[in-house]
């Protein structure tokens, strides 16, 4: 059986510092550009908009009747009743509902786009158990028609993740769901990167079937631990180099490795973990693994058995991104209950999220949350709309590390807003108007705001 690479990294990198002699002019300080592909997104509309007479779900646990939302310069300026303000645009939303823009924390749009043909399958780099060096943003095709379909369902922000074949699948990217010709034109400015990890059946099946480690769950854990040991050594070598240079010495920089740049980003608290993990005991092990190497376990995705460890997730500050009713399709996805989301949500300081992992259900993520609310309320819970909306707005933003920017209709936050024709938790509801940073990006009643990707031109 193939073994994981031996831990010689620290010796090799440490040797690079042997040149820390104060002789000759000091070399330039080698710095790693942590954002070589920056966002080029910019707010497209600075006009002011007043939405009046709506039922407003703020995303912070409030439900306001006959309320107004005032947007100025792409930000939420005020939310309340009978606002006395003047605006460039006024919309009477009598009988309609207003919520924050919907956020999906688990999508593969652009990396597994439509049409689903082999040449477009760019989400899983199944060449090694550890491909932390790959960035899914380099696979994202902005012309995927799925982005427009998702926007029609109120999706304003989404995280694109690599697939779950590998122990470390690579970096995810958070996007603004706006029409653009490049990925960078959609990239959410300054949003933290994510690192996709995967527990359980997928990595051991993909590599074990070829008699390559990991072949078992214990092989999975060994692979994670070895990678974090090497990442810790890489981090130490660069910190020693930085300290030596700051002290006026003349060290040689360690050799750069983009795989370990990503893992170091996690250790430094700059990259957030997003962990494909179904079973309770495996989520618990991943929390312990994070403690062993002093990083945060982040968000657990799918989490079929999250209800079994809801207290542990809350105590660790981990979000759980869950499906309402998708389970039983493989053994590790067997032991779920329909109350999963609600049980996680019921614990103090919890972070329950409803996600899609689907190009279909992302179009109706409000209905996915609605399924949970209506089902559990028939079984003794008392979930209200103002609480359930958090699963696809504020809590989702928290999972992505952008809760200070979006996810609620709070003063000063980005004006990512959806006007619904009726209660968004009704199966009959439709997103009528969608705003991103205060700019109208979709209007069900105006074709000018119904974007069509270049790929779809002439096809409908």
Feature-to-residue mapping (PLM):
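Bacterial N-terminal signal peptides that target proteins for export
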Residues: 1-8
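C-terminal motif of bacterial Sec signal peptides marking the signal peptidase cleavage site
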Residues: 16-19
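Histidine-rich, glycine-flanked metal-binding segment
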Residues: 33-36, 41-48, 56, 60-99, ...
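His/Asp/Glu-enriched, well-ordered alpha-helical/loop segment
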Residues: 39-40, 45, 114-115, 121-127, ...
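C-terminal cap of metal-dependent C-N hydrolases
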Residues: 54, 398, 410-455
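Divalent metal-coordination and catalytic microenvironments
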Residues: 54, 69, 74, 95, ...
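Polyanionic/metal-chelating signatures
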Residues: 146, 151-299, 430
């Amino acid at each position: 059986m193939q073994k994981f690479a031996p831990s010689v990294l620290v010796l090799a990198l440490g040797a690079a510092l042997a040149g820390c002699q104060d002789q000759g002019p000091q070399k330039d300080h080698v710095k790693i550009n942590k954002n070589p592909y920056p966002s080029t997104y910019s707010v497209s509309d600075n006009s002011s908009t007043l939405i009046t007479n709506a039922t407003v779900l703020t995303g912070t646990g409030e439900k306001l009747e006959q309320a107004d939302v005032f947007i100025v310069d792409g930000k939420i300026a005020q939310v309340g009743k009978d606002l006395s303000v003047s605006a460039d645009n006024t919309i009477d939303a009598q009988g309609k509902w207003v919520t924050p823009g919907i956020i999906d924390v688990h999508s593969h749009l652009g990396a597994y786009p439509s049409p689903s043909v082999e040449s477009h399958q760019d989400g899983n780099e199944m060449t090694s158990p550890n491909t932390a060096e790959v960035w899914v943003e380099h696979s994202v095709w902005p012309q995927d028609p799925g982005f427009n379909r998702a926007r029609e369902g109120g999706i304003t922000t989404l995280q694109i993740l690599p697939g779950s074949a590998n122990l470390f699948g690579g970096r995810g990217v958070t996007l603004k769901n706006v029409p653009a010709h490049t990925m960078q034109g959609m990239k959410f400015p300054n949003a933290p990167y994510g690192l996709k990890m995967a527990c359980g059946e997928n990595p051991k099946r993909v590599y074990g079937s070829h008699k390559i480690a990991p072949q078992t769950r214990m092989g999975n854990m060994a692979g994670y631990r070895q990678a974090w040991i090497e990442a810790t050594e890489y981090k130490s070598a660069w910190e020693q180099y930085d300290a030596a240079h700051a002290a006026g010495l003349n060290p040689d920089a360690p050799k750069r490795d983009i795989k370990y740049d990503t893992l170091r980003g996690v250790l430094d608290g700059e990259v957030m973990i997003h962990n494909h993990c179904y079973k309770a005991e495996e989520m618990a092990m991943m929390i312990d693994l994070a403690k062993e190497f002093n990083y945060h376990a982040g968000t657990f995705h799918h989490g079929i058995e999250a209800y079994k460890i809801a207290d542990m997730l809350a105590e660790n500050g981990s979000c759980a991104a869950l499906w309402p009713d998708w389970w039983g399709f493989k053994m590790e996805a067997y032991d779920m209950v329909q109350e999963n989301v609600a049980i996680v949500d019921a614990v103090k300081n919890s972070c329950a999220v409803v996600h899609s992992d689907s190009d279909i259900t992302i179009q109706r993520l409000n209905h996915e949350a609605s399924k949970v609310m209506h089902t559990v309320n028939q079984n003794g819970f008392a979930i209200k709309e103002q609480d359930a909306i958090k699963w696809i707005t504020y809590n989702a933003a928290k999972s992505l590390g952008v809760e200070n920017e979006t996810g609620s209709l709070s003063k000063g936050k980005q004006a990512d807003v959806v006007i619904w024709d009726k209660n968004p938790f009704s199966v009959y509801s439709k997103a009528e108007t969608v705003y991103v940073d205060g700019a109208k990006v979709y209007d069900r009643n105006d074709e000018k705001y119904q974007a069509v990707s270049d790929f779809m031109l002439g096809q409908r």
